[in-house]
Amino acid sequence: MSVIVPPALVPVSPTTRVISCAADEIGEVAAAIVATVPSDGVLGVATGSSPLALYAALIRRRAEGLRTEGLRLLALDEYVGLAASDPRSYAAYVRSVIAEPLGIPAHNVRVPSGSTAADGAAYERAIAEAGGVDVQIVGIGRNGHIGFNEPGSDAETRTRVVELDESTRRANAEHFGGDLSLVPTHAMTQGVATILSARRIVLVAAGSTKAAALRAALTGPVTADNPASFLQRHPDVTVVADPDALREDR
């Protein structure tokens, strides 16, 4: 695995490390970091396509002896209005893609749910009661969102219901048969401040469609216009991305 960081993409923050590797290496490289979580630690999990290779690598490591059954999982977000049993829900994703293959029992898995401020506050309490997150996995949206913190989300936000940007809904329509009308308009998401409270953050990104947002997050000003830019304020961030996501000319 080679580490090649284009000069223009040297992050502003001295506490952010960027690892550039081939797209098919991202999962293994990120999993090596995530595997440092204690066997009974707390892992913050993202959903979607970006971290799939990471989870597959963790599953392989479990087959080779990594102890994962004692991990506690805390998910970043969930659509409002989808039952946990709905295969399109993030509760179903976390269960089928992460928890069950890693042997993690249901009582050690929490996914945001509900649609009220009280529900958001309850999830914040659950994070605190777990002792906080050891490693938080995140992706980055084309508009710079992390979790479902869309542009305009400030650094003080906590778990809450948000309205999804149309660009986000369009990007996720593939999981709803390509029908935008079926994609929920709102979600419950951990806030920026919630994400930043994790002890370590690992961001995974692949493909040129993420390049502009990632470049702005790493080298641009810290601004609510690109919520991922708030990661510059965190003391321990590792970005694992392929050369396309780190291109300077996008």
What do the PLM-derived regions correspond to, one by one?
Residues M1-L43, A245:
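N-terminal glycine-/serine-/threonine-rich phosphate-binding loop
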Residues A57-R67, P151-R160, G220:
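A glycine- and small-aliphatic-rich helix-loop capping segment at beta-alpha/alpha-beta transitions
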Residues S2-P14, L66-I137:
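Ligand-binding beta-strand-loop-alpha-helix segment within the catalytic cores
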Residues P6, A193, S197-R250:
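ATP/nucleoside-binding phosphotransfer catalytic cores, i.e., glycine-rich phosphate-binding loops
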Residues R62-R72, G103-I104, T194-A198, L231-H234:
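Short, conserved loop/helix-junction motifs that constitute active-site signature segments
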Residues V45-S50, V138-R142, A206:
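Glycine-rich beta-strand-to-loop/alpha-helix junction loops that act as flexible
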Residues S39-E64:
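Glycine-rich N-terminal segment of FAD-binding domains in flavoprotein oxidoreductases
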Residues N143, G147-V192:
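Class I SAM-dependent methyltransferase SAM-binding "motif I" and its flanking Rossmann-like core
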